């Protein structure tokens, strides 16, 4: 593998993240595995908008330097390590603080509802990992349970991380996560976030499995409300699909409805 090209690609991804406002200043970190125990990563304390390929550091899985450098690997290296150890299929990790995704994480919300078919096909849900102090075992312990069956995570009061086979795919997953959180935020602000019906989610999962984008066991391993009967609190479909839908009213709303109905009969 041409390591110089990998370093240049990491800088390109870092620049995209910076230019799109997915991170600021020295926030976030990016890495790419080029051999089983050889990883190229962004250095600590350097703005992602000002990086150069020669600034990249080369480390082993434990974060020990493999090449001389005046720069150190990010203090959040343990997060990258646990992802690579849990997922042999993963060769790139992108961690950032996208505003909408991080807003969800601060609000205690996961990206748990199937609201866009493209997202079900390409990303799946993004669980919310409990808060853990950055750069400590607390954080790695918080994210580890979700790594096997999910390709992106929200981290409470921290940010988001996405991982894939390539740097481009990992960035795409992070960008998709942020875009979906933004759409979800807009829908919730408008007062209604409809979800894709369970049977449609099943079809999307089947397509994803056929394309090799998801292992069959990952379907039931998803911790979000993507499994049948658990897909959010509302489901869309043809008008007839909602005839038997239960509707909850407060006592005051029920009284008002009955009063208005009585007025109709008095006219």
Summary of predicted features, one role per range:
Residues 1-267:
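Glycine-rich flexible loops
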């Amino acid at each position: 593998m041409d390591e110089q090209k990998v370093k240049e690609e990491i800088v390109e991804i870092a620049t995209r993240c910076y230019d799109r406002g997915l991170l600021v200043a020295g926030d976030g970190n990016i890495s790419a595995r080029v051999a089983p125990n050889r990883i190229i990563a962004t250095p600590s304390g350097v703005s992602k908008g000002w990086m150069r390929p020669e600034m990249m550091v080369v480390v082993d899985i434990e974060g020990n330097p493999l090449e001389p450098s005046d720069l150190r690997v990010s203090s959040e290296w343990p997060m990258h390590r646990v992802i690579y150890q849990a997922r042999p299929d993963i060769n790139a990790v992108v961690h950032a603080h996208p505003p909408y995704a991080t807003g969800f994480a601060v609000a205690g919300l996961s990206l748990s509802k199937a609201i866009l078919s493209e997202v079900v096909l390409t990303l799946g849900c993004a669980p919310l990992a409990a808060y853990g102090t950055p750069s400590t075992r607390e954080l790695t312990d918080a994210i580890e349970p979700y790594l096997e069956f999910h390709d992106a995570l929200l981290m409470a009061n921290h940010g988001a991380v996405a991982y894939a086979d390539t740097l481009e795919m990992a960035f795409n997953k992070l960008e998709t996560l942020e875009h979906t959180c933004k759409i979800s935020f807009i829908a919730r602000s408008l007062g209604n976030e409809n979800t894709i019906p369970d049977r449609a989610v099943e079809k999307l999962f089947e397509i994803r499995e056929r394309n090799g984008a998801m292992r069959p066991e990952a379907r039931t391993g998803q911790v979000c409300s993507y499994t049948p009967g658990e897909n959010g609190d509302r489901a869309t479909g043809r008008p007839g699909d909602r005839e038997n839908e239960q509707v909850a009213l407060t006592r005051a709303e029920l009284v008002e409805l009955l009063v208005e109905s009585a007025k109709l009969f008095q006219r």
